[in-house]
């Protein structure tokens, strides 16, 4: 099945292909050399990145993969953004010690409503070589006999090789049958779209390789897999929605800038590599300057401006930097984000504004003493979860809010 009218003319520039194969790349299957040969052959490849719509926004972790798609798009290759409208209702067990809650079709539809706009911040949606698809379009049509035919291409022992399943068995935890089927149905996406390649984070390697296996068995065709490095904090924890340290693509420019500035210095170089378009040679120069003893804050300011510009444009990034400088050089924040409770809990109100990613993050910030009432200069405790008095607050180092108890105060 082809979703593109005709192959595009592709660019085979050695330097651009070299950067494509190395920047942010953990591993290529079967090999980087085999993929390089394809890229130099002037063949127009079709590749995809899949997103399970488990939340209403996208974050920098998604941006890492979208930036890689943009590199392929700029070379003339066809790229597909695949929504997991079907697989999101199963729930990806990747990295989970327990089963994910299954989403309803209505929840999935609501979550994807803003995705295209956010993805358009990184991909060029005006070009003909980008498509948006949803796996519910074919997976919802599968009959029981079709499902059995697909599932018969895999063995139980293959699926049990997953690290998280081994861990659950070791701990005596349940593994549900629908979780076994997740990589099977995701693999079927690649076969249905007849793609040449899939891009994703290296935590998705098992799922992506399942697609490679199914492609060989059903179509006798090679499917390349590009596993990308993950954006992780110094403890190795992935930056994302579930982890409570998310930089959302829907965040305001000042919030994006402030959140990046709160990153530890150890994330500066990997942040440049994964989340910006700064050339690799320039990143090497930045690394050398750090080794010579340059103040990391100077580089982090540039990183924050680069990432904010990627999401919101250069003009908004400059304004965000000016606001940051005013807040932390002069001690006067230029703006407070307005938060109106209207009877809602503070956690819900803050999540709606993308100030925090989850109630877990808010609880962690309170435990760390990272939320301060600026009117009384007091740190907030657990009681803030239930009763958040109107006033001005600092959350962490770089987020400022003004809480209104009602629409009249």
PLM features per residue range, with description:
Residues 96-101, 149-152, 242-243:
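Short, hinge-like loop/turn segments at secondary-structure boundaries
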């Amino acid at each position: 099945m082809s979703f593109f009218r005709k192959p595009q003319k592709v660019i085979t520039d050695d330097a651009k292909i070299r950067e494509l194969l190395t920047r942010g790349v953990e591993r290529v299957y079967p090999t980087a050399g085999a993929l390089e040969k394809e890229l130099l052959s002037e063949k127009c490849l079709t590749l995809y990145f899949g997103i399970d719509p488990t939340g209403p926004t996208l974050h920098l972790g998604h941006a890492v993969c979208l930036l890689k798609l943009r590199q392929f798009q700029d070379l003339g290759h066809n790229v597909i953004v695949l929504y997991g409208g079907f697989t999101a209702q199963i729930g990806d067990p990747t990295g989970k010690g327990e089963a994910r809650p299954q989403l309803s079709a209505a929840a999935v539809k609501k979550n994807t409503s803003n995705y295209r706009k956010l993805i358009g911040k990184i991909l060029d949606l005006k070009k003909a070589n980008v498509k948006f698809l949803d796996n519910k379009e074919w997976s919802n049509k599968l009959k029981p006999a079709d499902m059995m035919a697909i599932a018969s291409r895999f063995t139980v022992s293959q699926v049990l090789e997953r690290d998280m399943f081994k861990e659950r068995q070791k701990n005596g935890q349940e593994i549900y049958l629908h979780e076994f089927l997740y990589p099977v149905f995701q693999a079927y996406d690649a076969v249905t779209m007849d793609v040449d390649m899939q891009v994703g984070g290296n935590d998705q390697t098992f799922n992506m390789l399942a697609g490679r296996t199914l492609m060989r068995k059903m179509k006798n065709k090679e499917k390349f897999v590009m596993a990308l490095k993950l954006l992780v904090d110094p403890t190795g924890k992935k930056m994302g929605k579930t982890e409570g340290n998310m930089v959302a693509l829907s965040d305001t420019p000042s919030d994006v800038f402030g959140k990046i500035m709160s990153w530890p210095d150890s994330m500066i170089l990997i942040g440049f590599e994964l989340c910006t378009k700064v050339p690799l040679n320039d990143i090497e120069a930045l690394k050398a300057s750090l080794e010579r003893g340059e103040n990391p804050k100077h580089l982090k300011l540039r990183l924050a401006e680069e990432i904010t510009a990627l999401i919101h444009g250069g003009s908004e990034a400059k304004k965000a930097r000016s606001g940051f400088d005013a807040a932390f050089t002069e001690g006067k924040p230029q703006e407070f984000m307005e938060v109106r409770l209207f009877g809602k809990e503070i956690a819900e109100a803050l999540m709606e504004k993308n100030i925090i990613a989850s109630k877990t993050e808010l609880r962690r910030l309170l435990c760390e003493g990272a939320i301060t009432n600026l009117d009384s200069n007091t740190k907030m405790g657990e009681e803030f979860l239930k009763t958040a008095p109107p006033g001005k607050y600092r959350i962490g180092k770089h987020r400022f809010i003004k809480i209104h108890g009602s629409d009249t105060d």
